Amino acid sequence: MQILNTLTIFFVLACNILHKTTNFAPSIRIYFVTMIDTIINAALRAGRAIMNIYNHPDLDWQVERKADNSPLTLADRESHRVIAEALEATPYPLLSEEGAHLPYDERKDWHSLWIVDPLDGTKEFLKKNDEFTVNIALVTDGVPVMGVIYVPAKHQLFWGEKGQGAFTAEVDPETLHVGKPEALPLKGADWGRPFRVVASRSHLSPETETFITDLRRHHPDLEMVSAGSSLKLCLVAEGKADIYPRLAPTMEWDTAAGHAIALAAGRKVLDAQTDLPLTYNKEDLHNPWFVVK
């Protein structure tokens, strides 16, 4: 996948102008191939920037985690910089965990926007267990329509877009070449296994324990699996798990990319109380408790 050149960027901008001034449809395939290519390349390059810091032999990992010179802060900022520069040429504004959070009065009229977490999984990063991710999503009218999750330490890429399906592939960390994609859910991922719930084995909230107890009544052989950061949503999208209850606080940038991938894989991400789909670019950027299934 090639990084956008000037002509391609011009084409994207022209599409957006035509869409605003005519009946020209921005959803033609070449337009969205361009967009997905943009965010995949942004995620890959941001992941490389993170790994340069993660593997740096001279950094002090004892520094306070959010100090300006901590590895976490350096990686977060560098990833954000790479992504912001890549998305600057697109027609849409950016809402990022690391960037400035604009007041709702400025955001409420945004028809489409990027929602980004440049380094999701701070605990995983600090523990050096490799389960941190780069998350980029395109949200239109509150719905995630395109998303990319890159796991740079494991060289694994996930992406999905509305109407086009969801996929995963391995990435060459040296060249950033994306290997042969596999469609999600993975063929045979649910064959011959027990019903699986994504949850922390060691830090279950009382509400999650109750939720799992209720599930056991219907699935006595229930099995729990765990993963870091947005990889929890990917497990359900892959078909390696059946349900992920998140009965604890999260922010929109924690879930937007995974939500897009889950939707493209035929899954649902629902408010645990109302059973309605999660929405984005809300006045309050906190998510309600939710369930992925």
Where are these regions (language model features)?
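Acidic beta-strand-loop-alpha-helix segment within the catalytic core
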Residues: 137-233, 282-293
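Residue-level signal for inorganic ion chemistry
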Residues: 50, 76, 87, 122, ...
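Oxyanion/phosphate-interacting regions
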Residues: 9-10, 28-47, 209-218, 225, ...
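Glycine-rich active-site/cofactor-binding loop and its immediate structural neighborhood
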Residues: 112-142, 146
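N-terminal subdomain of lithium-sensitive/metallo-dependent phosphomonoesterases centered on the IMPase/IPPase/PAP
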Residues: 31-119, 175, 190, 210-213, ...
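Extreme N-terminal basic, low-complexity initiation segments
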Residues: 2-10
